[in-house]
């Protein structure tokens, strides 16, 4: 029995770790290599999954992107390896391989999960993981889970995550075995005879610390460490985005979002008197009279010329979900996706250089109806305390004229706090998903179909029409063109089958266009049609294969169509002025006529000085500070990192959308001043609660 016992004891002792600095460093490096391979594999998966965006970009560009990405991956790997580096101070800690394997497996599994999730996130938003993730998590969990379950291959991703986590655990276990020295222990305790003394381990730690600091900084230059802009080394926005690390991007967004001092709010960069005067020069026109100038930035009395008004009584704003300009036939889009909107454009006035102020429905709603821009730190204005401020939108201006109102929507008004926000602004009648009886189709995620919404809209408009009735304004908002693109069966339009990953999106857009066409076909038979101004506008666009500049203008460019009696006779059929959603309210008020006091952050696009090409200030969703100002054929992009120089692009929309960088553009300084002045002054007005028709605080 002595020999078997001795053999058993020998095997047990051989399984115990005799920690050495050399073996521990080898283990750390091998584990780091496993994580680096995982991040490169995730980057490759992101590239392959979104391969439609490659277009004619050469392979060398993506090789450069992957090389750039290694530096960001290495930064995260260094962070995850900190416990292993600290273990150099203790022989017992170095021996705790089981704990290290557990930590690395859990941390890498989380990063793997985020990487898998990011493949569809990027396809949808053309951005790496950012503050939008937290915004969706913050919303109604039932709706979010329903959207994910019905809109994305959740089971497939969960299986891939489980298999990937298992493989990672095997890889870390293999790294442990490959670097585990074997030696006898006395009494089962850790021997320290082969472990370097503490001062030697301290010296090794200092060397490792220096190496890790350099690796985490990502650069040997003096000054700031590697920034996200350092990956923007190619002409392809897709390739540049690939160079980022989604986990790091999400962590940065979390830090910004959870910052107690709200670091993501725009900070003043200019003297306020200068910024305010610049904004006034941008917005106050010849028919405006500035009022309350010592308190309010751009509050003014506007009297539109009588010859530019229209014989209208009512106003109907139709906010179309994800109605992207790049797929509208009248704007040069292929595939016959919007035949009804294309035909409607022949009887109205179509703006072909129009943009949403943001890339989320939330921003489209308050920009279009409340006439307030999308600002850094206030992308979800309607859910913030500042969202309770009285602004200067259509509800305030038309309620003051004793207009009746109605807001018809497929979904739940609680989702973006629409009912709270718009009722506070002056609206009184809300028709949401729970108010529809026997709808043609109801989606468990979002609500009823667009055709149901439009049919109910017809009922509500007719109920408000009549000789003895008040004039009315209405907001009709569609929703079917949103993930998971649940549509009625049988579908009244032909499915799109030749656009790859965009097939479902474009099919839903074609359906929304059909529903819009049915609405107008029925509405034009009603008496109110001949005395109503209809505004059809997209809440935002969506990305496709072509990313126009790093701002991805396809996500912002939307149609804006005005239909009203006599509009073509006075203003023509096509308008090339640059505008955004915050220009809609003053443009409406200009057609109604009569003096109005407002503080809109846009202008009447049909009463601009001769030769004025218009402008627009835009910002993508998320918590970052990247913003841009658009002119007739140029766009200046101001990166979120204030230390980085802005970029000027010359862009083109229509049948051949593209953008190219303009080196040393002469208007860079001018447009940057205008953009920063606009953001700074609008932010100050909102925080000071002086952005409305009247002050929200005592003088």
Tell me what each language-model feature is.
Residues 12-16, 178-199, 463-471, 568-572, ...:
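Intrinsically disordered, low-complexity coil segments
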Residues 69, 73, 147, 170, ...:
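Residues that form generic nucleotide/phosphate-binding pockets
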Residues 218-599, 608-614, 619:
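Soluble catalytic regions of membrane-associated enzymes that act on cell-envelope
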Residues 191-208, 212-215, 472-480, 489-491, ...:
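Extended, compositionally biased low-complexity polar/Lys-Gly-rich tracts
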Residues 61, 507, 558, 624-625:
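Short loop/turn microsegments at loop-to-beta-strand junctions
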Residues 119, 151, 322, 540, ...:
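Conformational gate/switch positions in structured elements
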Residues 7, 16, 225, 568-699:
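Membrane-interface soluble catalytic domains
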Residues 2-264:
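Transmembrane and membrane-interface helices of multi-pass
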């Amino acid at each position: 029995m002595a020999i078997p016992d001795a053999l058993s004891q020998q095997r047990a002792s051989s399984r115990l770790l005799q920690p050495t600095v050399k073996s521990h460093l080898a283990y750390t490096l091998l584990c780091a290599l496993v994580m680096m391979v995982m991040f490169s594999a995730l980057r490759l998966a992101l590239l392959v999954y979104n391969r439609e965006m490659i277009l004619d970009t050469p392979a060398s560009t993506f090789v450069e992107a992957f090389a750039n990405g290694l530096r960001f991956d290495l930064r995260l790997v260094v962070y995850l390896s900190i416990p292993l580096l600290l273990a150099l101070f203790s022989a017992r800690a170095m021996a705790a391989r089981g704990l290290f394997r557990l930590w690395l497996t859990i941390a890498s599994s989380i990063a793997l999960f985020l990487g898998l999730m990011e493949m569809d996130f990027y396809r949808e938003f053309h951005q790496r993981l950012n503050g939008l993730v937290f915004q969706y998590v913050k919303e109604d969990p039932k709706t979010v889970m329903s959207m994910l379950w019905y809109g994305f291959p959740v089971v497939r991703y969960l299986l891939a995550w489980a298999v990937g986590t298992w493989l990672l655990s095997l890889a870390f276990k293999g790294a442990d075995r490959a670097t585990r020295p074997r030696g006898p222990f006395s009494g089962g305790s850790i021997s320290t005879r082969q472990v370097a003394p503490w001062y030697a381990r301290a010296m090794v730690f200092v060397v490792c610390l220096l190496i890790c600091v350099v690796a985490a900084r990502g650069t040997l230059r003096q000054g700031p460490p590697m920034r996200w802009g350092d990956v923007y080394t190619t002409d392809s926005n897709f390739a540049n985005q690939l160079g980022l690390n989604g986990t790091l991007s999400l962590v940065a967004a979390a830090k910004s979002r959870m910052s107690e001092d709200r670091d993501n709010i725009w900070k003043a960069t200019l003297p306020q008197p200068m910024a305010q005067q610049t904004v006034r020069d941008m917005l106050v026109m010849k028919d405006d009279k500035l009022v309350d100038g010592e308190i309010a930035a751009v509050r003014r009395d506007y009297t539109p010329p009588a010859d530019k008004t229209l014989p209208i009584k009512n106003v109907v704003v139709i906010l179309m979900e994800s109605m992207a300009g790049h797929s509208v036939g009248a704007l040069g889009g292929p595939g016959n996706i919007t035949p009804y909107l294309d035909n409607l454009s022949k009887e109205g006035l179509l703006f072909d250089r129009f943009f949403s102020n943001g890339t989320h429905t939330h921003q489209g709603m308050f920009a279009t109806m409340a006439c307030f821009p999308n600002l850094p730190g206030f992308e979800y204005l309607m859910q913030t305390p500042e969202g309770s401020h009285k602004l200067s939108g259509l509800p305030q201006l038309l309620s003051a004229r004793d207009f009746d109102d109605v807001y018809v929507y497929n979904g739940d008004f609680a989702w973006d706090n629409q009912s709270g926000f718009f009722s506070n602004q002056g609206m009184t009648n809300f028709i949401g998903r729970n108010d529809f009886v026997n709808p043609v189709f109801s989606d468990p995620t979002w609500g009823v179909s667009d055709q149901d919404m439009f049919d109910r809209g017809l009922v509500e408009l007719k109920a408000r029409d009549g000789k003895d009735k008040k004039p009315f304004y209405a907001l009709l908002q569609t929703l079917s063109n949103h993930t998971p693109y649940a549509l009625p069966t049988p579908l009244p339009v032909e499915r799109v089958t030749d656009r790859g990953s965009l097939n479902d999106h474009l099919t839903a857009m074609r359906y929304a266009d059909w529903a819009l066409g049915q609405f107008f076909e029925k509405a034009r038979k009603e008496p109110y049609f001949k005395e109503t101004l209809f505004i059809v506008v997209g809440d935002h666009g969506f990305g496709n294969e072509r990313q126009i500049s790093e701002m991805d203008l396809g996500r912002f460019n939307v149609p804006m169509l005005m239909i009203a009696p006599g509009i073509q006779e006075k203003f023509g059929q096509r308008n090339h002025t640059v505008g955004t959603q915050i220009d809609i309210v003053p443009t409406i008020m200009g057609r109604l006529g009569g003096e109005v006091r407002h503080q809109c952050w846009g202008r009447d696009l049909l009463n601009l000085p001769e030769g004025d090409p218009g402008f627009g200030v835009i910002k993508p969703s998320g918590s970052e500070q990247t913003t841009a100002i658009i002119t007739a054929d140029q766009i200046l992009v101001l990166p979120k990192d204030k230390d980085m120089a802005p970029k000027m692009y010359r862009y083109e929309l229509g049948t051949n959308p593209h953008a190219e960088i303009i080196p040393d553009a002469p208007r860079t300084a001018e447009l940057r001043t205008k953009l920063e002045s606009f953001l700074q002054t609008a932010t100050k007005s909102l925080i000071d609660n002086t952005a409305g028709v009247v002050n929200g605080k005592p003088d």
